[in-house]
Amino acid sequence: MSSTHQLVSSMISSSSSTFLAPSNFNLRTRNACLPMAKRVNTCKCVATPQEKIEYKTKVSRNSNMSKLQAGYLFPEIARRRSAHLLKYPDAQVISLGIGDTTEPIPEVITSAMAKKAHELSTIEGYSGYGAEQGAKPLRAAIAKTFYGGLGIGDDDVFVSDGAKCDISRLQVMFGSNVTIAVQDPSYPAYVDSSVIMGQTGQFNTDVQKYGNIEYMRCTPENGFFPDLSTVGRTDIIFFCSPNNPTGAAATREQLTQLVEFAKKNGSIIVYDSAYAMYMSDDNPRSIFEIPGAEEVAMETASFSKYAGFTGVRLGWTVIPKKLLYSDGFPVAKDFNRIICTCFNGASNISQAGALACLTPEGLEAMHKVIGFYKENTNIIIDTFTSLGYDVYGGKNAPYVWVHFPNQSSWDVFAEILEKTHVVTTPGSGFGPGGEGFVRVSAFGHRENILEACRRFKQLYK
């Protein structure tokens, strides 16, 4: 391996990593916030045409996998960042792309995990497999903290290793014969998991959409809430509020419309509330605040963006007892069977941390970290607003949605990366409705946020 390649390999790490600055940016040493300690080796994952295939099995590939377009959005961004570092090995790259938290987990939470880990080294404290649904005290704490007074019982809560994992488990439960609707733009895992499950048709490059998916267009003109009168009936409706990537939060009136729409069509809403604790106004933080939602909705959430658990992994899904299939069978019973078959329960160490999150001290600590990220969003919003751009989001979510009219999202992404060494996320990666937008994440150390904004001003002034 060449010395240059060794250097680059050592520099490609987490989204919060910083690198040595090019001279034209006049960056000070203090902006390099993190040590370059993680080494990542290159791994070939696909046979190239030049390689001779020695042997192949007789197993056919899942035809649905071939429908997927290129790579999943965030690994593709990481690939382009890596290529950029090969081109500019001395660049101080700042990542405001993937929504990965950067601030340390509060000590009140990590100390609980450390205590649990130590207990596992003792006869008295050791435990093996836990309940697949999660520890009873944690299920009770989640129900009380997030759903108190909403009719959600402890046994309606299923603890998991993250909301993204639960989305895939839900897709396995729903099977290949359901139809789905998604906000456009929306978190790409909804669509990609649907493609893998065989719920969709082929990808139409002319309109950048998959067949058999109802894309619910969300734009500045409609307040990022779809006109439901134009949306066809589907079995499943994926809905995220506050939304990733737009940052928009649905109002009580809008969610009431959504619940009524689902009831009229006999649909199930999969409500993603991963950013509910970022809400600054009085809009609903849970779909179950809407009367009747317990008959048509389930909710998935996570500690990832609240407590910095992106690596710790701990989330949950709520499925009320009143949510029934067309034959009257409870949806929760099928999900329970799925997790008992496909999952052995969340880590007991992670669950100890989650329980600490929901103590008064833990909640205070989480709100403090969330407040820090929201200050970052204000800095980003002020920057692009001062440059004359239309900016959305940020108030109720850690993402800022910036409009670059009449431009390709990937072109804007490439220009920003090339000229400022800042990684963002192209809006079109979230669906055709994201074309012409770029998502800027507020997850970052304050010095990096300020430096990135300085570079934005230098580029677009």
UniProtKB/Swiss-Prot annotation:
Temperature characteristics of this protein: Optimum temperature is 36 degrees Celsius.
Cofactor: pyridoxal 5'-phosphate
Pathway(s) per entry: Amino-acid biosynthesis; L-lysine biosynthesis via DAP pathway; LL-2,6-diaminopimelate from (S)-tetrahydrodipicolinate (aminotransferase route): step 1/1
Entry-linked Pfam families: Aminotran_1_2
Induction, as annotated: Not induced by pathogen infection, but down-regulated by dark treatment.
Residues that hold pyridoxal 5'-phosphate according to the record: Y129, A163, K164, Y187, N244, Y275, S302, F303, S304, R313, N344
Tissue localization of expression: Highly expressed in seedlings, roots, stems, flowers and leaves. Lower expression in siliques.
Transit peptide segment: 1-45
Places the protein is found: Plastid, Chloroplast
PANTHER family the UniProt entry points to: AMINOTRANSFERASE
Protein name according to UniProt: LL-diaminopimelate aminotransferase, chloroplastic
Name of the coding gene: DAP
